[in-house]
Amino acid sequence: MFPLVLSLFLGATSDIWPLAPAEAFQLPPCQLINQTVSLEKEGCPKCHPVETTICSGHCITKDPVIKIPFSNVYQHVCTYRDLHYKTFELPDCPPGVDPTVTYPVAQSCHCGRCAMDTSDCTFESLQPNFCMNDIPFYY
């Protein structure tokens, strides 16, 4: 019984914990990485891939043992510290459709609270190169 409790506590079984604690420290830290993202705009027929920098990586998080009612617990995520925006003109947009698209370029990253206005903090978000124009539309 004790080895089972110990393994559950330490996260040694992959059925309960996806990563053992020692493995979590081998994940890449929160840092800038180069990433291809797909730019698209309603009314324009194609997506256009561009290379940009994004924040990606692991942030150490903790969950309090004692839960205090009505208190907020914030998990840190890898997010932008500084960023600027670039503008790109999509090719092949029909007349009357503004072809300009603005996208963020990360300059530095940190582990902090998620800012929903600049980051996607969902559990599983769309991939950066996802393109709505690639999905067939059925009437």
Curated annotation (Swiss-Prot):
InterPro entries: Cystine-knot_cytokine (IPR029034), Glyco_hormone_CN (IPR006208), Gonadotropin_bsu (IPR001545), Gonadotropin_bsu_CS (IPR018245). Pfam families: Cys_knot. Coiled coil: none annotated. CDD domains: GHB_like (cd00069). It is found in: Secreted. Glycans are attached at N34. Residues 1-24 form the signal peptide. Belongs to the glycoprotein hormones subunit beta family. This is Gonadotropin subunit beta-2. The lineage of its organism: Eukaryota, Metazoa, Chordata, Craniata, Vertebrata.
